[in-house]
């Protein structure tokens, strides 16, 4: 297993953790009946921390398919180098840091970390595509 695939697997575990944490906080606020029910009726917005963790998870889901595709392109082209490894690390560790930064409400640092993690995707993809050419 390459570093990039290991970090892809680690990101899946991070996503599961974020999903369960956000769901737990939402259930704490809205109750078990809401969680077990069909959720047909509109509900008020989540509170501060539950809402932030829900949005952090949704943000991960927006970028994760791009990261996964970039890793798989690198694997398919046989490109495995410092740039692909570095890009995968930037993405994963940026996403790890993003969760507590978003939960704490720290705006500019959170955005900078998001930018670094997104740059990791670009780095990984560029290294895979241009090294294979």
Language-model-detected regions and their locations in the chain:
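Interfacial loop-to-transmembrane junctions
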Residues: 97-119
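Hydrophobic residues within alpha-helical transmembrane segments
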Residues: 10-13, 57, 89-93, 112, ...
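Helix-boundary and loop/linker segments of multi-pass membrane transporters
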Residues: 1, 40-47, 77
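Core segments of transmembrane alpha-helices
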Residues: 58-71
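N-terminal signal-anchor transmembrane alpha helix
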Residues: 2-39
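Juxtamembrane boundary at the C-terminal end of a transmembrane helix
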Residues: 124-133
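Interfacial helix-start motif at the membrane-water boundary
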Residues: 46-61
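Structural signature of hydrophobic alpha-helical transmembrane segments
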Residues: 81-91
């Amino acid at each position: 297993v390459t570093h990039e695939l290991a970090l892809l697997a680690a990101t899946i575990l991070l996503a599961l953790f974020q999903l369960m944490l956000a769901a737990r906080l939402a259930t704490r606020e809205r109750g078990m009946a809401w969680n077990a029910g069909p959720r047909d009726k509109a509900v008020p917005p989540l509170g501060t921390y539950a809402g932030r963790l829900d949005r952090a998870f949704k943000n991960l889901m927006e970028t994760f398919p791009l990261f996964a595709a970039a890793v798989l392109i690198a694997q398919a082209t046989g490109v495995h180098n410092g740039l692909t490894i570095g890009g995968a690390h930037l993405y994963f560790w940026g996403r790890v840091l993003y969760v507590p930064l978003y939960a704490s409400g720290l705006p500019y640092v959170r955005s900078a970390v998001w930018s670094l993690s997104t740059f990791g995707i670009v780095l990984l993809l560029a290294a895979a595509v241009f090294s294979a050419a």
